[in-house]
């Protein structure tokens, strides 16, 4: 079963500036990774709620929400279920070394990107 929202990825014109803005709203830096060159993960101060993953836009990308990711316990099973239900544009599952997670990306009927994610730890 697909669980709660794990994270919301935002592509910003300046990741550091966006992370500082979220800190002003009460979010705390969870970790910084080399994902997308440099990425910040921020969580609510009370730990209750999804993370924001922030990175600086590259190339022809434009600032905005890149995707919303949902936590899962068994990514292989959920990916297979999505394929059987003919969900569009499934890519994955695949492991991302820089985050220690396995992800599958897919799109909604309007082409927006969604993701399921499983911690590998």
Give the positions of each predicted feature.
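Conserved beta-strand in the GNAT
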Residues: 52-55, 114-115
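A short, local hydrophobic-aromatic micro-motif
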Residues: 6, 30, 66, 90-91
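Short loop segments at secondary-structure junctions
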Residues: 46, 73-75, 109, 120-121
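Core segments of cupin and vicinal oxygen chelate
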Residues: 2, 9-50
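Vicinal oxygen chelate
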Residues: 4-13, 32, 41, 59-121
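Short amphipathic alpha-helices in soluble, non-transmembrane regions
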Residues: 20-25, 80-86
């Amino acid at each position: 079963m697909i669980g709660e929202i794990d994270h919301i990825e935002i592509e910003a014109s300046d990741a550091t500036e966006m992370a500082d803005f979220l800190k002003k709203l009460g979010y705390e830096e969870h970790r910084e990774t080399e994902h997308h060159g440099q990425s910040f993960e921020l969580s609510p101060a009370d730990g209750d709620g999804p993370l924001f993953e922030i990175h600086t836009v590259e190339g022809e990308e434009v600032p905005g929400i890149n995707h919303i990711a949902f936590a899962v316990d068994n990514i292989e099973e959920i990916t297979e279920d999505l394929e059987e239900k003919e969900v569009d544009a499934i890519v994955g599952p695949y492991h991302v070394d820089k985050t220690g997670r396995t992800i599958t990306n897919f799109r909604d009927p309007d082409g927006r990107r969604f993701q399921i994610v499983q911690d590998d730890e």
